[in-house]
Every structure is written in structure tokens, then in C-alpha cells.
Amino acid sequence: MSPSAAEIRSAYDKAKQLLLDQCVSINGQSAHWYGELSTSALSTATAMMALLQVVKAGRSARDFEINADFEQLIGGGARWLVEHQNQDGGWGDTTKSMSNISTTMLCHAVLSMVSGQWSVAGAEDAVSCAKNYIDKLGGVEAVRRRYGKDKTFSVPILTHCALAGLVDWREVSSLPFELACLPARFYAAVKLPVVSYALPALIAIGQVKHHFAPSWNPLVRWLRNRAINKSLQVLERIQPPNGGFLEAAPLTSFVTMSLVAKGLVDHVVVRRGVRFLCESVRPDGSWPIDTNLATWVTTLAINALKDDVPESLRPDLMKWLLGQQYRDVHPFTNAAPGGWAWTDLPGGVPDADDTPGAMLALYHLVQWDVPYPEDEEARERHCRKFHQNSPPVCAANDGALKWLIDLQNVDGGWPTFCRGWGTLPFDRSSPDITAHVLRAIAIRWWDCFYPESLPLNTPPHHRRAFKKSLVYTACAAAIDGFGFLAKTQRRDGSWLPLWFGNQHAQDDENPTYGTSRVLMAYRDCRRLETNEAQRGASFLASIQNPDGGWGGAAGIAPSVEETALAAEVLLDFEQYRSQAFGGIGWLINRLYDGSLTEPSPLGFYFAKLWYFERLYPLVFAVSALRRSVEVSGPEEMPS
């Protein structure tokens, strides 16, 4: 039974307040949403290994001028791992994740070292159970099968195990760290065997492999010996001042353990990395997958609340977001100015998902969700008023839009970090990111210009002529973007996302998330009548569970996040509105039984590394409930 308009309004008000209560000020910063990323067995194991290598090299925290005890941190991590081992002997990436070969091999390796040096209750039994799990899945070959030709994660995992003496160095693939000495503009051309964000691992792990098992080819050995110092200079230059590469404990740990193992324990990159790891450990002895997604969850919250963001919060939120836009070329990915990262911390990198999120949030903070003008003259007045009333936001969004257009791939889609860097998944165009960019273009420009101003059948050579102004450039880019979405839609009408999955679905896919996000672009760009949008909506409606909720795919147990996304977008398809309200009812039940804020491990933090974020279910639910309030009206009963 669908909820009444009054029930929806009441539920929205309650959920909205829960979300607003999470907007806080810490350490004197402007109030914003911080969220909380899942703690991680993988992060904990790699951080422990990095510190173990430092201890093995004869260094203490005092040598690093750090107020910590390395052995206590290692012991605390070991106890946490023992306590959170799954019944099958393995570990998953989060405390809610099923076991996988990668995380289990990392945990097994570090606990093997710890149990041989310290007395940790249960460690020996944990090591034995983990070994049985690893042997059953196939060990090294199972890791290689999981990642295929992408060496971004398989080589670091095997390096970690080699440092524990459990894998022969000959099993660890060499990484061409000498390529890091090339100017950054050539990285795309040389097709690195790792994705763009893994350059630090390419350098450090490539060097430790070269140290322990150099190439048989004398010319390659000579070249790599010559490249050691210069590539280390690159590594030092791209490391953020707080030491945390991408604010990620795993990447920072892989770099640190590798450099220490090859004798560089006193190198500045190591010293910064160790400090970052010591400062990011949690009270229970574990490490999170990343420090935070503060910028990302703040923009999600603003875009969910829209004009319900309190007036008292708007100036500080706007100032905080504007202050995070990159004004200089980024030293890590060589990204041009104009983008936003997922965090306000130094390890962030501008990307094509957080940038449109920030653009949309700034627009909503200024616009207070002004209704879309119906006639062309009103749209032009609306646009002029927006420019006059908020020049800093317009300037920021124009800069971001130029940045996004320059990032667009030749296939019409958008990658995450770097245009045309390589062929590996996390550097290729993806539907969910492309859809997010299209939504930012729509709210920035198509509030004044119909998409029909540049028809879909416009010849390519005519489209290029529109580049005389940003608006036409944006429209041309958007049409190419919709072309990419049409090409990547699957036969069943769904789209697959890059950054989200579902561990219970086939191949860890999440067509519910991907299709919902793409349909939001069709909605915001007023293309719901297209064949692609209708097929996508039909797919979403077809996989709803009997209880009204949605999982990641057909027949998968529902989650708050997936139900909220699917229900919200289906509210705009009249033929599926009753099903959408069924999903809203499911969310309302979760609100009142206290499980609405229970997160699910749906996020991918690079290369099949799962995470969950505490605020995701609440933010997505608020967005869906708010839209259902608008659709149901003040008195109307949804049918």
C-alpha cells in the first residue's frame, strides 16, 4: 500500500532533520558534512605491513618525531584483524563484506609476520584458517585472475606477500617505473600498466621489485638503475604535504613498505607516509579505506535538500565549496585548474564525479531551487539574474565546465581523472560519471537553452563550429555524451556504473545504481521520452522486489541506497509512479524501524575494493523522499 501525502511529508521532515543534524563544525572549520568511511581489513593489513618494515629496519616512532608506538599500533591492528575474520577463514574489504582472495592474502601475510614476533591471542589460528581459504581459491593465480591485465592492485598485493616471505619475487610482475621520468603529458601515450591514480605505486613497487629481482635484460637493468633517483624525485613531488597519497591508507602503505624494504627508511616520502598512517589509525586499532569523502557527501547532501538547506548554513557552505576548487595544475595527475576532489584534504585529486557534484551544489545554494521557466524570454531573464546575483558561483562553474569539456574522451563519455590515459576500466569513460557531467551542464546552461537548439543529428563538423562560445561547446559536448550513453546501454535497458557494485550480484555489478544515475541525467535534460530513457525505466521497474525495495539487480535483497535511487527517478515516469511510491513506502518503513541509516557495502574504492559510507543511505533517502513530496502534492494520495 502506497503512503499518503501526509505520511510522506512527515517522513521527509524527520529524515531531513536527521541529515541536517550531521552537518557539523570540527576544529573551527565551516560546518559541513563529514560522513564516515568504512574501516577496512585491507587498509589495516597494509598499514601494519608498512610499520612492520619500519620496525624491521630498526626505526622507532621517536626517530620519526612521531608521538606513537609502532609496536602498539601493529598489535592493535593484529587484534582487530583476528576479531573480524570471517567464518570461512577469509576477510572482506569491509566488516560487511564477503571474503575475497586479495584482502585475505594481505591479512594472512601480515599476521604471519606478527605471530612469529609477538604474542597476539588467536593470531596463529587465524593464520591457519586463512591459509586454508587461500589454498582453496588458488593463491597467486586467483589474484591474477581477479584483476586480469590491470596490475594496479595485483602487483601491490603480491609485493606485500613477498615482503612477508610468502611469495617468491619472481611471481611479482615488474613495473616500468622508469616511465614516470617522462613528462606527464606522455603518460597516456605510453599506456602504463596501472591506472592514472596509481603512479606512486608504479614508482615505489617497481623499484622494490627491481631491487630484489631485477630484469634479466642488461639494457633494462641499466635503464632502471639510471631512473631510480629521478623517479624518486617525481614521487616526492607528487606526495601531498600530509603524506597520504589520495588520502588512502592502502596506497600510502604500499609506497612506504616498498621504499623501506629497499633500504630507504629515512627517505622523506617514507617519513611523511609513516606520519600519515600513525595519524589516521582509528581508536579500535583499524585503518579506514580513506580519510573522508567530506566534499562528496556535502555536495550529495546539498543536492538532496536543495532549497531546504537552512539559510544560516548557505554562506559558509558556499564559501567552503568555492575554496576547494583547484586553481593550479595538480602535481599528481597534472590536471588543469577548475575541478574539485572528493575531500578538502591535501591528498585529494580533481575528478569528473566530484566536480559536477560541486557545480550542482553551488547552483542549489544560490538558486534555492527556482522553478524552471517555461518560455524562452523567462529563461533568458532567469539566466541573467543568476549571473548578476552570484558572480563567484558563475565564474567557478564556468571554470569547472571548461575543465570537464577538456576532459571528455573521444568516445563522448567522461573518465574519472585523466582524458585518454589508458584502456584500464578506471581510466575509461563510464556511464555514471558521464551522466553526472550531463546533469551539471543541464543545470548550468539548459536552464536558458533548449537541447533542441543543437539537434541530435547535427553533423560533427557543424558541432565544432559551436565552440565559439561556452554554451554551444557545452551543448555539443552534451550531445556527444548522450551518444555515449546510447552506445553503452545494455540490451536489457540498463547501464553499469564504474564506482559502485553489489557483492551479491553477478560479476559484482550494480545495474540498479548505474541505471538510476543515468536516468537522472535524462530527467534533468528533459529527455525522458527518448527510447533509451524508456528502456532504462522499464528495466528498473522490472527488477523491483515484491516488498517494494530494490537491490543491485533482479532477485537481490534490497538496500536503502538502491531503493532510494530507483524510486526517486521512477517518480518522474508516470507509468511507473505507483511502483516508485511502493519504494517510498519501503523507505518510510525503514525510517521508523530504525534501519534507514544502515549502510551497505556498495561503493568501489578503486579496483574492486569495497567500501561503505555512513551517510549514503540517509542522503539518498532524503533525496527520494523530497522528490516524492513534490510529486504527491500537499493533499493528493499517491495511487
Please describe what each predicted stretch is.
Residues 14-24, 31-32:
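N-terminal signal-anchor module of multipass membrane proteins
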Residues 98, 638-639:
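Extended, basic/acidic-rich, low-complexity regulatory helices/tails in eukaryotic proteins
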Residues 1-12, 32-76, 87-128, 132, ...:
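An alpha-helical repeat/solenoid feature that recognizes helix-turn-helix modules
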